[in-house]
Amino acid sequence: MAPPVRYCIPGERLCNLEEGSPGSGTYTRHGYIFSSLAGCLMKTSENGAVPVVSVMRETESQLLPDVGAVVTCKVSSINSRFAKVHILYVGSTPLKNAFRGTIRKEDIRATEKDKVEIYKSFRPGDIVLAKVISLGDAQSNYLLTTAENELGVVVAHSESGVQMVPISWCEMQCPKTHTKEFRKVARVQPEFLQT
């Protein structure tokens, strides 16, 4: 059976220098090893030597969307003023827990903002690349924008359930029924394409 995982906080005394040597996420003071991070305590030893004591952070749980970060999100609902989304990835890193975001009508396009209609840009279930423009507060969500050519819908499904193909910057087409639907289509950059 694996030993229980021990979590520690910054400044917590882990052991004395005779019991281990300091590794990453630690520092020494007065003959003791202390944690410099919040995370899991790890002890590794090779060939019966004094174990190296280190503290590893759970990176995926610590990752938060920050202003300017490109995020991948899924549209959950739309109305005439904004689209509600769940943020699933920050860059290419998946999040343990989804964050809520809002794309306002005026943040969808860089031009002709007064002519934008939400239902011609997004539909519930669409996967969207967006950029964080504001962190919001305790009551509100992250504010996101798609007002760049590289941002917008990257995956959408037609009413028949088939993944649609982009045919212009504002339309996608179902390959099965050839029905066209309006979307704010992203010009996907090569680094985001998975082959």
Curated annotation (Swiss-Prot):
Pfam families reported in the protein's UniProt record: ECR1_N (PF14382), EXOSC1 (PF10447)
GO biological process: RNA catabolic process; RNA processing; rRNA processing
CDD domains reported in the protein's UniProt record: S1_CSL4 (cd05791)
Main location: nucleus
UniProt-annotated location(s): Nucleus, Nucleolus; Nucleus; Cytoplasm
Entry keyword set: Cytoplasm, Exosome, Nucleus, Phosphoprotein, RNA-binding, rRNA processing
Subunit annotation: Component of the RNA exosome core complex (Exo-9), composed of EXOSC1, EXOSC2, EXOSC3, EXOSC4, EXOSC5, EXOSC6, EXOSC7, EXOSC8 and EXOSC9; within the complex interacts with EXOSC6. The catalytically inactive RNA exosome core complex (Exo-9) associates with the catalytic subunit EXOSC10/RRP6. Exo-9 may associate with DIS3 to form the nucleolar exosome complex, or DIS3L to form the cytoplasmic exosome complex. Exo-9 is formed by a hexameric base ring consisting of the heterodimers EXOSC4-EXOSC9, EXOSC5-EXOSC8 and EXOSC6-EXOSC7, and a cap ring consisting of EXOSC1, EXOSC2 and EXOSC3.
Organism the protein comes from: Mus musculus (Mouse)
Claim: RNA-binding is one of the keywords in the record: yes
Record protein name field: Exosome complex component CSL4
Keyword rRNA processing: yes
SMART domains the UniProt entry points to: S1
Function recorded in the entry: Non-catalytic component of the RNA exosome complex which has 3'->5' exoribonuclease activity and participates in a multitude of cellular RNA processing and degradation events. In the nucleus, the RNA exosome complex is involved in proper maturation of stable RNA species such as rRNA, snRNA and snoRNA, in the elimination of RNA processing by-products and non-coding 'pervasive' transcripts, such as antisense RNA species and promoter-upstream transcripts (PROMPTs), and of mRNAs with processing defects, thereby limiting or excluding their export to the cytoplasm.
Family listed: Belongs to the CSL4 family.
Phosphoserine modified-residue sites: S21
Matches recorded under InterPro entries: Csl4 (IPR039771), EXOSC1_C (IPR019495), Exosome_cplx_N_dom (IPR025721), NA-bd_OB-fold (IPR012340), S1_domain (IPR003029)
S1 motif domain mapped to chain residues: 66-147
